[in-house]
């Protein structure tokens, strides 16, 4: 079976936005106009094609990125829907990693919101070119030009409108295409499937000319030949303008900006045209970095059908009918269903049972998958998110994704004995799907703890246990992931010696313990010379310290951000062993930590609260009571925005408190930012409670 769509006509794009900017509705309309859906699914009635998990239908927010294939004007668009809620940024990170381009959707009223800034930063981090779609132009208070300014000021980007609205709110009927200099007006009878191309209305001609001039100037800056033509007063052709927009979009010096109203079926076709005109094909993005596992050298993978297969698993889902689906972005070569593939990250061979192309929640079996495609593999047992799949003879490990550590834990207890076994299996499956979700057993109590990125994240996990796996579970109070660190440098020795008949134990070490920069982790330095401790025992000392650092001396929390230097010691020919040195390392570390001024750290959340002005004083007072540090205060569309760092432990139940303090008019978002030192009076309480 040959490839149906040439590589240069494929677009792998994501739709990224803040909650309620209308992202799912926009994806829906794309599927409707490209002929994949027959009836439009509205988020309001819980029937959107992309939102296919039960809870998403209920909450009206998108949680997992479903990958969908659709076609537009001889091009294949692989659409990845990304969640807009801050607890799910890991999902967004994951999809950014495998996208070639993105459509950022902004609400014409709300503009740039906190989550949009986070998603924008992630897209910058992975170098993803994007276009902006200003949605909801039919809403009261819609203002396209406001959003343009916010993108400049808040996101420090260079938005260049390629179409501007005709009318606004109730009178929004279409757009002016600044490239062709024509008006495009949608008619309501055909649900926006048909539109008329007309002359520009006279009252908008001046504004259109002014914006066209800005567009042409931005395009001319992309190319010397175009610049000369522009400065010489010559007209640029439509083709030249399009080429210039694409160049600027790909090198990220400009962001093409369009508008519409997905809900009212206006502006979606012009958005699709922009996707194929300006966003990159797999062949137009930089080559993907990888490492040759044999030589550890850097290698680059060029997107093409030639060459051995290479792909990245970026998402795992459990499908009720097929079992486990592994979503893979193919970068090079091709693969047939039924063949074997090598997982170079795990060094294991896997057999691919079936290859499925997903159309939101319908699926079609395909025989073969090619470079540039996104496809679900069925039958992989050991492959997890972030693993590389490739050809064994030409192995490569593609750049890994980094997953954040959980900041909040909740104890879960199965209600009955029958739930106990099911719960273990279910939590294992959920942890495979979502790398930012962790499951662990608390040693002292034997309780199962689940960890995640926020309260909503864990709520949804518990909800899925009930719905998908039929496990009834009780949940405990949320617990915060505290950490410990040290503030001063200390040197200590420890001699571990046991001589009680038979073979003894002997390990003797001198270590220096030093604090490191926040967030820099653990470092072990070996400065043993002259063989005072034989080489084979050095890793045992390191291992002893790594085990001991899991339980700090203050309150038994993991110790972070320190450096240990092993600089002296001694050994015994007969009695020394790895075990003895492991114990010596562990004891020396504990003694040194006690003397190194240990302190408790807690997760600090970046909180953004949006409230009407009259509640501002109460909200700030409340954040101060929660030990918050106020960083800035801004205005946005008649509301006050307060930015603060607040300890996570003080934020439980905040949504209820904020709602009652502002009569339901305040909203907030929070995400983990950094670990900060706990004030000593509060640290004392926490330590006593732990030891109590």
Curated annotation (Swiss-Prot):
Task: Tell whether Nucleotide-binding is among the UniProt keywords.
Answer: yes
Question: According to its UniProt record, where is this protein located?
Answer: Cytoplasm
- Ranges for domain tr-type G: 8-283
Its domain of life reads Bacteria
* A Pfam family recorded for this sequence: EFG_IV
Q: Which GO terms describe its molecular function?
A: GTP binding; GTPase activity; translation elongation factor activity
One Gene Ontology cellular component? cytoplasm
Q: Which residues make up the binding site for GTP?
A: 17-24, 81-85, 135-138
The record's listing under SMART domains reads: EFG_C, EFG_IV
CDD domains, sorted = EF-G (cd01886), EFG_III (cd16262), EFG_mtEFG1_IV (cd01434), EFG_mtEFG_C (cd03713), EFG_mtEFG_II (cd04088)
Sorted UniProt keywords: Cytoplasm, Elongation factor, GTP-binding, Nucleotide-binding, Protein biosynthesis
GO BP, sorted A to Z: ribosome disassembly
Q: To which protein family does this belong?
A: Belongs to the TRAFAC class translation factor GTPase superfamily. Classic translation factor GTPase family. EF-G/EF-2 subfamily.
Recorded hits in HAMAP family, A to Z, give: EF_G_EF_2_B
Q: Which PANTHER family match?
A: RIBOSOME-RELEASING FACTOR 2, MITOCHONDRIAL, TRANSLATION ELONGATION FACTOR G-RELATED
Role: Catalyzes the GTP-dependent ribosomal translocation step during translation elongation. During this step, the ribosome changes from the pre-translocational (PRE) to the post-translocational (POST) state as the newly formed A-site-bound peptidyl-tRNA and P-site-bound deacylated tRNA move to the P and E sites, respectively. Catalyzes the coordinated movement of the two tRNA molecules, the mRNA and conformational changes in the ribosome.
Q: What is this protein called?
A: Elongation factor G
Q: Which organism is this protein's natural source?
A: Helicobacter pylori (strain G27)
